Amino acid sequence: YKRQVFSAQAQNKVSAPMKDVNQVIDNTLDSLNKARTARPVAGSSRKGNNPILFLVGNSTMRTGTLGNGNNGQWGWGYYAGDYFDSDRITVENHALGGTSSRTFYNRFWPDVIKGVQAGDWVIIELGHNDNGPYDSGRARASIPGIGKDSLNVTIQETGVKETVYSYGEYMRRFVQDVKAKGAHPILFSLTPRNAWEDKDSTIITRVNQTFGLWAKQIAEEQEVPFIDLNDITASKFEKFGKEKVKYMFYLDRIHTSAFGAKVNAESATEGIRNYERLELANYLKPVEQDTITGSSRKEGCPVVFTIGDSTVKNKDDDKDGMWGWGSVITEIFNSKKVSVENCAMAGRSARTFLDEGRWDKVYDALKPGDFVLIQFGHNDGGDINIGKARGELHGSGDESKVFLMEKTGKYQVVYTFGWYLRKFIRDAQEKGAIPIVLSHTPRNKWKDGQIERNSKSYGKWTREAAEAVSYTHLTL
């Protein structure tokens, strides 16, 4: 490696390749035939004369060969289609893990560009893998910068000869190829890594002096849009804080979990929507507005939100029927000083309350000074991936495991019961609200003349979750 870098600098006067800061081994390219069959045929999703949005990128856009989350990692391209009107445009994710601007352009771009037609859109986000040796190993490095430098190399393992260009030159060629088809290229900066300026920093490290800068420069040169995805998501991560950012990633500091992938997809959409006069924004779905959660708020007064299962909210409409305590707790509060909203839902566990987007609605409605009463545990002990599939791992730690869900056929990372409670607690804290965690209500189940407790399972894990983040815990 040292010999090769010396040769490149001394004989060809090009810069040394970028250092591999990710330190992640991605062997996707070891199976090119599998990769080609797993990804869509370019243009195959086209509906009539509708345009297609093509996504070109690496594992942060499509993790692994299949991109199905079977290792707990997801790329943001998987969720991008959720934001577009599929009756007017389709989204094809052609990204592939392990590719750099150089390897994607040489090996996969010819197949993608074949399917591009006039009026289509192509988002290009590459650079995470433009590092390492020029002529050995994965041999995927591009020359740093946007210059016209080139380097003739012979791949040591195969004897194949190749001319290597700068990162900017590869991006320039992507853009020009798309323009030649009458389509519209958009350059994106890289997704941010879980990398902070230093151990005490609250600032996510940007790529605005390297790949982000170079992509922006090429966009300006070629007069095409540039969207700084790196900065949009990094700004969100900084508001989240380090603990929350940890689970935006899975297994390493570059590949996102489903949580992180959704944030990146949302950021990409925001960048498109907010870019002045970008026609692609016209194909986005309208932003949904929740006009119900938080609607009881009175000016200058907090809201008490309750979340949980059927013991918190049931039918609650028949004096002789079943009621949840969240529907009667209003009576003990001064309605002139506070309002109460019961957001619980029967049959939900902590996990399914989150998965169904119910917590997101509460989270979005929270304001500083609000309260959140959190009570789960009755429905959390069932099957994890079959039947109702609402159980979690036992305990309150950070353990997690990937499961294949029988009903949906999709992979999902499932965490411990306590992990979900800690997420609710920290999310509330992030918004300036006050979370209060309650152990679940007792059942009409007796032993030796006493009501049975769950003090060694869900009661214990609830207490541990609250104590882990120093928040109030009440034993119901």
Say what each PLM segment does.
Residues 1-4, 472-475:
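Conserved small/polar residues in nucleotide/adenosyl-binding loops
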Residues 22-95, 111-122, 141-143, 294-345, ...:
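Serine-esterase "nucleophile elbow" of acetyl-processing enzymes
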Residues 59-63, 96-102, 128-133, 191-195, ...:
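Solvent-exposed loop/turn segments at secondary-structure junctions
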Residues 91, 123, 246-294, 340, ...:
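Histidine-centered active-site loop/cap adjacent to the catalytic His
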Residues 105-165, 354-412, 443:
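Oxyanion-hole/transition-state-stabilizing segment in secreted/luminal serine hydrolases
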Residues 192-229, 442-474:
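Substrate-gating cap/lid alpha-helix
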